[in-house]
UniProtKB/Swiss-Prot annotation:
Lineage, broadest ranks: Eukaryota, Fungi, Dikarya, Ascomycota, Pezizomycotina
Protein's pathway: Secondary metabolite biosynthesis
Keyword set includes Iron: yes
Name of the featured protein: Cytochrome P450 monooxygenase pspC
Organism annotation: Penicillium soppii
Keyword set includes Kinase: no
Cellular localisation: Membrane
Annotated binding of heme, by residue: 454
Coiled-coil annotated residue ranges, if any: none
Cofactor list: heme
Sugar-bearing residue positions: 150, 385
Amino acid sequence: MAYTLTSIVLGVVVFGLTRIIWGSISWNLRYRRFHSSDGCQQLRSAPSKDPILGLDHFFRLGKAAHNSRYLEAFQEWFQAVGSTFGVNLMGDYVIFTNEPKNVQAVLVTKFKDFEIGQRRRDNSAELLGIGVFNADGQTWEHGRALVRPNFTRKQVADLGLFEKHVQRLFEALPKDGTAVDIQEWTLDTGTDVLFSESSDVLLPSATEVARKFAWAFNRGIDGIAQRIRLGRFARFYYDPQYTAACKFVHDYVDEIVAKAVYRAKEWHAEKKDKPVPPDDAEEERYTFLNALAREGVEPKQIRDQILNILVAARDTSACLMSAAVFELARRPEYQVQLRREIAEKLSGRQPTFEDLKDLTFLNHFVKETLRMYPPVPLNARVAKNDTVLPRGGGSDGMAPIFVPRGQLVVYQVYSMHRREDLWGSDAHIFRPQRWETTRPTFEYLPFNAGPRICPGQQFALVETSYVLVRLLQEYSNIEARGNSAPWREHLTLTCSVGQGVWVS
């Protein structure tokens, strides 16, 4: 028996060593092939006190995240090491980059060499299931095709939807100057666009269920972000509050999906009886939820896709809106300039879609908000194949680097947007006037790029611009209340204002 056990242990050891040796040989052969054909050079690595597990880096980033300094810590890292480098994080070797040419390669020119990857699906599936946010291949393509009509120019140009929610915001803002956190309001428009019904979290009549949905959804997103930061140790993450939040979100959305499925059956029956609508019939607004239900998609899959898009569309809009109001409330000089432009162009009337495009300084203000506070400040892809990135190798970081299949590449938009060599010595300062002459390319990516560019970017831009105009028309002064400290990150899958956006 002892002999057999010894043989088994020895066999396991030999097998493990063989895999390690073969993996090393295989990697070196692949590296040499790319080195000879593409001129790849060694990627720089961040210096570490623990070259085996990189515990010093792992705990450093954990502390930074706890102190709401995660993005700032990476910015310091890039300044110290370079625009592209490798880091060992608890046994995971990760490539970090804020180099525009590398980001362009990952998202556009070498798009087919990269994917979202299984780890993101594993980390987010408990809340989101599988959908356009975390899927690859045909699942992603199909979901993307269905959601695209939700954000066409015709849909986005329907400003009546935004005005409805602006009026609800005006109702919610106390007349006596009491402060309110405007970040909560942005959930309403997101659910209205996707569900055809609002969560109404800001209305005085809002139900406890609606408010709990807003809380549970945010709590679920926090849990996903925590899992992602834990890397390969995410499988050991357990938080009963996160699990409860996921269940509540599912129950809430399942009720909405059930209503949509019922409406879809009625729609098909009516279409069968009246295949040609009358000439004077009012055209129905397209919603992603109704489209999925009418296509006959299973309710569970509808829920998954809806939650995936809610993350992408709602959170993008929410982060942009909250950051814009955060800056506006703290900069009375820009309020004066914006009011002057709005008064000259609109003469007191509500803006049209075309008006919003003609408000030059407003557009500069929104662009600068996106530069300073990109809604998705960092993102990641996994290499599907052995490939090459154009920068990061050699002593100066200008040579190509080999990226093996399965390699995680994290690209940092936040720090790229604040690089002084790309944006000037005032890159860290909020200055909308820079957009009078600035014409950036891949150094400015607030909504991603390539085939996976954010489908809701026009929705976010139009909503933010419209709401800013209406706030400035309605109120003679917008003041920041509560915490007057500088902007602090609240980083999950997106990045919002950590201290909230308390205004009156």
